[in-house]
């Protein structure tokens, strides 16, 4: 009877290590489509912010200058209002309007300073469209009553408490005021 030679042992060990390595690589690549990728969220947040600031809420001819009427209607229609025909979106869910999978959460908010010229120490606040005065006010202001036709310029679930969110910001002009369009994806 012939015993196992060193060469037989080496060939067996190489085959074993090769099979184990193949299994680990195959399982990792088979599972990767089901794991989240923060880089994908970054691309999504930037794409949504660009689409909103440059097209849906304004005009491609004048990007980052938001149409007051369509911007107000965008937030109002997602909270039960109707969509005007002249605006560049349809009456769908937020995710459908911005082209994001239902498996991702999206929050769109417009923040800014409504007290006067911005300074380095200002903290932007969430904005509200006051329908009776036809002007922007702080969402926390007593002049913002969403039950009487005023529109809170925020839509989507609140990301507070989420472990990881990706945020894209765009400097925009709304109703003659500087504001910041904030898109959060998680």
Description of each model-found segment:
Residues 1-27:
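N-terminal single-pass transmembrane signal-anchor helix
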